[in-house]
Regions:
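Active-site and NAD+-binding cores of ADP-ribose-processing enzymes
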Residues: 1-78, 100-215
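A short, exposed loop/beta-hairpin motif centered on an aromatic-Gly-Thr core
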Residues: 79-87
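Conserved structured core elements
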Residues: 88-92, 165
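Short active-site loop/helix that positions an aromatic residue
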Residues: 91-102
Length: 215
């Protein structure tokens, strides 16, 4: 998936990755308000438009969550048509992560989690946080510390094309297949705030109606 420090073969790389993942923190979703942004598609049947073709409102609550499979392109943690829900800890981060072209409309909704969904935590971000995390989780292995920082970089990189997401999707597939978690917690390159990607039971998460924003 990515080169190890000693250039071992892919199987050894996978073993190193799994060793690191097994020592990463599992966390439940903090019970606070989280935000979801969806770029509004042209001629979307779920949107009301004015006579000039501009949307009059955002998506209603039942459409503010994970998008229909037909609208989903490959992303950081999902293949094309795969319904992974991306949300952020504040409105600004949600909008930036949606990466809407200038002049496009975005619908921003919020939700409050009250469940025991478990995520793998890649969010320690500052030098002090990373040092504390490494000393606690990886005190027996400098290699695992190195692997964690590489995984975190892959999940945070501000990639834009579907093709460039191959590495992060391969990593997330490894997590899905080998770790008993429902998603990941990671850092936004744009704001340094937390994002979540949730692949289990994401259609049952309730959102507010979306507010209309212009990118």
């Amino acid at each position: 998936m990515f080169e190890s420090k000693n250039q071992d073969n892919k199987q050894d790389n996978l073993s190193c990755i799994l060793s690191c993942l097994n020592q990463c923190d599992r966390v439940t979703i903090p019970e606070k308000k989280w935000y979801r942004a969806r770029v509004i598609n042209e001629d979307d049947a779920d949107i009301v438009y004015d006579g000039m073709g501009n949307p009059l409102r955002g998506y209603l609550s039942d459409k503010s969550g994970v998008a229909p499979a037909k609208y989903i392109s490959s992303g950081r943690a999902n293949d094309r048509y795969e319904q992974v829900l991306y949300i952020a800890e504040d409105e600004e981060t949600a909008q930036k992560e949606a990466r809407a072209d200038e002049g496009r409309y975005v619908s921003v909704a919020s939700c409050n989690f009250q469940n025991d969904m478990v995520l793998m935590d890649f969010s320690p971000y500052t030098e002090e946080q990373l040092s504390d995390y490494a000393n606690t989780n990886f005190s027996d292995s400098q290699l695992n510390t190195y692997m964690f920082t590489q995984i975190q970089k892959i999940l945070t990189m501000p990639e834009y094309s579907e093709k460039e997401y191959i590495i992060s999707r391969t990593l997330v597939k490894c997590i899905k297949e080998n770790m008993d978690v429902s998603g990941i917690l990671y850092i936004s390159h744009f704001t340094g705030k937390k994002n979540m990607a949730i692949w289990d039971d994401n259609k049952f998460i309730k959102f507010t109606d979306g507010c209309l924003k212009l990118a």
